[in-house]
Amino acid sequence: MLGRRRFVAGAVALSAAPFARRAFAAEGSVGREAFAPHAPITPIDARADRLIDVRVCTRPFRAEGPRIEVERIAGKTVVHNYGHGGSGWSLSWGSAAAALSLVDPKPGSRLAVIGCGAIGLTTALTAQRMGLRVRIYAKERPPEVRSAGATGVWSPDSRIVAEAHSTPAFERRWEAMARYSFRRYQSLLGLPGDPIEWHASYFLSDVPFSQAIDGGGESTEPDYPDLEDRLISDLHARSVALLPEQHPFPVPFARRGEQLTFNISAYARLLVDDFERAGGEIVTHTFDSPRQFRSLHEPVIVNATGFGARALLGDESIVPVRGQTARLVPQPDVHYNLYYRGHNLAVVGRRDGILVQAQAEDDFGNDRIEPDRAMSEAAVARLATLFPRTT
């Protein structure tokens, strides 16, 4: 079990949770030869005046896990595919396949997808590849959709289900979705613009990784199961401990691993372009009530509205989880990720900007979308301490 309070007290972004747990589990392994020599680590120019974007993403958490099921609404067959917490990008391809398997539409038939974020786009593309004629209806499209503000790393069990609801049946479905998505992402490596790539990831700590960091305090957020460690650990190489001479960071404890990373700007553009080249159409449309589904021409609708399903369907099982990210000016040689345990800092060296993330104690249950620039500037200042200037 991953204790949420312990994890936030340790101030590591939940996107790094699997990497962190592997670090805790492998405290003693020091890998002098486990990795080929890496290029020198380019320092990050961490200054607040280099911030180019600060935005908020609302993660749609459901204690029971994603809602992937069918019901009849307004004379339509509606397939729900929402509520993926912090795992939307990671599980999107497998979730799309699971959702569409519930209706098995015939090739050539028409299908509507409501929503143009991570889940909506991948569901639409998956349906096209099944031979369907697909139209997306959405209020927003990338880069305005909420999921465009995500961290951009492989995190398939991030806030995907509460520990109490992680049944054997759920875990089988989750594993199938995760493995399907992972295979799909490997087919997207090496494309122009590098929408998907593997990054070296460094996990840093002031104390041994086996030593818990407990900041105390109470939270209404549940604990989460360690699904990635238990069910798909074969998809990742283990992280290794680094000796002080093997890294430049001013910390006594460091580990290095590999992490699948999404350059969301390029990746979202790829998805939209592929969808439209295959004959798909994106229609700007706002739905205020599911009764409006009746006006659509398509007999089958996939509801991929994410957090929007809470208002659209009145689904109170969806809990908002606020997530703020900021981006620094891109640096061409910064293609690594950093997680500084105990300092509320996660960094992803994306090509569309060096992403800097910090968490707040009140993120769970918080649907506020206004950015807090001061919080991001403070995170950038903490990042700067990892690259002390010598001049």
Question: Where are these predicted regions, by residue range?
Answer:
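Glycine-rich active-site loop/strand segments that organize a redox cofactor
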Residues: 141-177, 234
